[in-house]
């Protein structure tokens, strides 16, 4: 069960939008709190380390955010979710399966370092498992990812990255698992 809180102003039409997105997921007891400007992450709060993580370190030189505020919001979200679950008679949320695209960061040249991008889009709830495979074997070295990024339609998107050295022998896969999928989805490159 997921409780999502997206706060943005719809009162007037503006050229730019800042979104404060937060969610709490039960029974996994995972949470996310982030700020977004025109679709790009400004920062998120690492709930384990209890600290603000700026998407670009330079952002932290011009602004500040106390992670404790997000942690307090999560405690309220958890309490609200528990109440809503009881009131809804434990009716589950609808699982919306993701759309997945796999592409290189730049034009591929054999032997030249590059990055594969697994773009996972239009899914809910914000729970996903991604595994990178090279020739069918899991790869973890150098792998990175974004937090869950909110969309205007209240679905989510997320990016996963794998640095690689292109060869003619290697085959790469981005394996995505989500509650809305009957089986894992593999995208090949």
Regions found by a protein language model. Name each.
Residues 1-189:
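Terminal anchoring/processing modules of extracellular glycoproteins
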């Amino acid at each position: 069960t997921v409780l999502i809180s997206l706060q943005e102003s719809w009162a007037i039409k503006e050229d730019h939008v800042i979104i404060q997105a937060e969610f709490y997921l039960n029974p996994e007891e995972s949470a996310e709190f982030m700020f977004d400007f025109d679709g790009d992450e400004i920062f998120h709060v690492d709930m384990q380390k209890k600290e603000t993580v700026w998407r670009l370190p330079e952002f932290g030189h011009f602004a500040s955010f106390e992670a404790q505020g997000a942690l307090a919001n999560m405690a309220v979200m958890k309490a609200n979710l528990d109440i809503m679950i009881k009131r809804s008679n434990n009716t589950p949320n609808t699982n919306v399966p993701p759309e997945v695209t796999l592409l290189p960061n730049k034009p591929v040249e054999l032997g030249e370092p590059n990055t594969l991008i697994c773009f996972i889009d239009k899914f809910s709830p914000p729970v996903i498992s991604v595994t990178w495979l090279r020739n069918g074997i899991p790869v973890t070295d150098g792998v990175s990812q974004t937090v869950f990024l909110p969309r205007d339609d209240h679905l989510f998107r997320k990016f996963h990255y794998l640095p690689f050295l292109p060869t003619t022998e290697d085959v790469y896969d981005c394996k995505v698992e989500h509650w809305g999928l009957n089986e894992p989805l593999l995208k090949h490159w």
